[in-house]
Every structure is written in structure tokens, then in C-alpha cells.
A protein has these predicted regions:
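Canonical BTB/POZ domain core
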Residues: 1-91
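Alpha-helical protein-protein interaction/assembly modules
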Residues: 44-63, 75-158
Length: 158
């Protein structure tokens, strides 16, 4: 009645599945499973007064969660993560450069584009200060192109 398959290795017995996420992302994922919504970061005066490191610690889990959502095909999580990140970076750009590097390392290009858009207007200042040296050439090209678009748009408006 039962057949034995000696050549098939069942991966369901694996002791651990390794995914590049921290506890913050897992906490948000569990909340999403139970409520259907990701916890939001209020981009209020408290957010604006946080240090860049504090802001980055709040944003990183959303990049990790976006990566996980892509890997596990969790519909809506990637988009919700993008919304949270974009709303925060549009109100305060303190952690943007570091976040760009982090999201790029995870291959989260939609998040990178959102972060690039939030700091494009600061490109000359960031370049001159040396803050962009940590970014790879592809990301720098994205930032330069977005700055050119920003400059052209600004030049057209009165």
C-alpha cells in the first residue's frame, strides 16, 4: 500500500530555515499575520528629532520584511513596507543614505528608488561631504539621474 522512495530527500525535516531578517521584521510579520496590516511609523516631530541611527533602526526591519515578502510571495507586505519607508523618508532624510546602502544590499530596488527620491535634492551636499562613498556605482548612478530629474523639474517651475 505504501511505497518507499529511497532517492527522495524530504526537506521538511530541516532543522532551520535561514532568512536574512531580524527580530524587528519578524515581529512586524507576526502582527501582519494577525491583523492584516503592518505597524506604521508615525512621521511626526518625534520621528524628525530622532538621530539617523535611531531612524535607521526603525527602517531596517521594513527592508528585511520586503525582502522576505519577495522570497515567500507574501502579497501586500512588500507594498506596505514601501509605503511606510517612503512616508518616513519624505519627512526626514537623516537615515536615507545608510538606508539606501542597506536596501541595495538586500536587492530591494523599489525601496532604494524611494530613498533616492527623498535625498536627490541633497546630492551635491552629500557628494561634497563624502557621505556617498559607501554606495556602489549603480546606486550612485541612480542618485545622479534622480538629481538631474529634480534639477530639470525645479528649473521649469516658477
Amino acid at each position: 500500500m505504501f511505497q518507499k522512495f529511497d532517492n527522495i530527500h524530504d526537506c521538511s525535516f530541516a532543522e532551520a530555515i535561514r532568512v536574512p531578517v531580524g527580530w524587528g521584521a519578524l515581529d512586524k510579520l507576526v502582527r501582519w499575520f494577525y491583523s492584516g496590516e503592518l505597524p506604521r511609523i508615525a512621521p511626526d516631530c518625534r520621528w524628525k528629532n530622532m538621530s539617523a541611527e535611531e531612524q535607521l533602526s526603525y527602517l531596517k526591519p521594513y527592508a528585511e520584511l520586503s525582502s522576505l515578502a519577495e522570497f515567500w510571495l507574501l502579497e501586500g507586505v512588500k507594498e506596505a513596507s514601501l509605503e511606510v519607508v517612503a512616508s518616513c523618508l519624505n519627512t526626514s532624510t537623516g537615515a536615507s543614505v545608510e538606508f539606501i546602502g542597506f536596501a541595495a544590499n538586500l536587492g530591494q530596488w523599489e525601496l532604494v528608488e524611494a530613498a533616492v527620491g527623498s535625498v536627490a535634492h541633497l546630492y551635491p551636499k552629500l557628494r561634497d561631504s563624502g557621505q556617498l562613498e559607501q554606495l556602489d556605482e549603480d546606486v550612485l548612478n541612480m542618485l545622479r539621474a534622480e538629481y538631474v530629474r529634480y534639477s530639470q523639474h525645479r528649473g521649469v517651475s516658477y
